[in-house]
Amino acid sequence: MFKKILACMLCLGLSTPVLADDHAVGGASSEMDWNTRKGIRFGYNYANKADESDRLDSPHMFALGFEMQQTMDGDSWLDLLFIQNLTVSGLDQSVLLPSANALVGFEIKDSLQVAVGANATVVDPSDENHYFHLVTAVGWTQDAGIFSVPVHLVFIPDVNDYYRVAVTTGINW
């Protein structure tokens, strides 16, 4: 039995790749280059069944916010993406509806963005204390000299069908 265990340990030790290819850990350069973008956002929000609320006259709302993005350059076509966003909706109806988002995702070819994360808001139209939600987003960012112009589509599902959809644009610097 001892010989079998020793033989297995020897095979395991010899099979460990000591000089492995480092492509999975950042390629030839292991430097992590982070880029930061930030900017204003404005656009349209649709909150399903929001007109059932006493606070809102319509489910269609204007959105205004500020967003920060950090990308880790992947030395190729794929970058890692972190997004933080604060948005206020309902100003067109004299209502203040703030929300915050934190997402993680990918940026493809420095333009197409796909992300998922958490959404927090201070208002729950179902009155069941559902203040945290999943948020998914897809967007396109176009270079504009020293600025860039993003266009994002956001979906926030809800267990009680009070989902939200948003389309935003803005400017990054």
Label each residue range with its predicted role:
Residues 1-29:
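Cleavable N-terminal export/targeting peptides
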Residues 20-65, 170-172:
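Short glycine/proline- and aromatic-enriched beta-strand/turn motifs that initiate or cap beta-hairpins
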Residues 38-44, 82-84, 104, 114-116, ...:
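Membrane-embedded beta-strand positions of outer-membrane beta-barrel proteins
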Residues 43-47, 85-89, 119-121, 154-158:
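Outer-membrane beta-barrel pore domains and translocons
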Residues 65-67, 101, 135-137, 166-168:
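Membrane-embedded beta-strand positions in outer-membrane beta-barrel channels/transporters
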Residues 69-75, 105-109, 139-143, 156, ...:
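Structural signature of outer-membrane beta-barrel channels/translocons
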Residues 75-80, 110-114, 143-152:
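Repeated loop/turn-to-beta-strand initiation elements of outer-membrane beta-barrel proteins
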Residues 160-173:
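Outer-membrane beta-barrel "beta-signal"
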